[in-house]
Amino acid sequence: MGTYFLQTPFWLPLLYPSMIWKNDVANKNIVLTFDDGPHPTITKEVLQILNEYKVKAHFFCVGNNVVKYPKMFEEIVANGHQVGNHTFNHLNGWKTETEKYVADFMETEQVFSSDFFRPPYGKISFQQIKALKSKTKMVMWSRLSGDFDKNISKEKCLENCIRKPLRSNEIIVFHDSEKAYEKMIFALPKFIEHALENGFSFELLK
């Protein structure tokens, strides 16, 4: 597993000012996001947890997975959650030519339309940003759970979420994927409870 920032350093949004790194509302809130789904069983479990706590979230969906599991995608939408484009084939922008990357984004737009996009791995070139910024709102994050990291425990995943005090308008990332499942399903309800107990609400981006 390569090096990654659990919390976004202050200078990174300065390099990519056209991207969304946090929410922008007055109340004490957190934006909860999930990447890489939908998955026929894992996403369903996530929806059950969110329903239990009456929380809404963003799901950044891989177009190919939406084609495979359309009913699961429909269930996300039916439950009042927001969906976003996560490319059709989960492309790494740093390893993909801009023309191919944009075409992959557009292929997902043919499957479902969304106002929001998150680049897989958070890796996108300046050229790709320039090509896409008029087509979508690009959403990054302020805090990673690290649930995708095979080298950490589920307890460490939870610690990543709550060790440093939460700040209003933060965007946090989990994954509704097989690789992340064990850590995500352990940490998610505990993180939600922690946030609610500390006076935060969960909001959707506008």
Language model feature labels by segment:
Residues 37-41, 60-69, 91-99, 118-125, ...:
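Acidic-and-aromatic substrate-binding clefts and catalytic sites of carbohydrate-active enzymes
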Residues 123, 129-165, 199-206:
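His/Asp/Glu-enriched short active-site or ligand-binding loop at hydrolase and phosphoryl-transfer sites
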Residues 71-74, 98-105, 153-159, 185-189:
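Charged helix-capping and loop-helix junction motifs
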Residues 29-36, 171-177:
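Active-site groove signature of glycoside hydrolases
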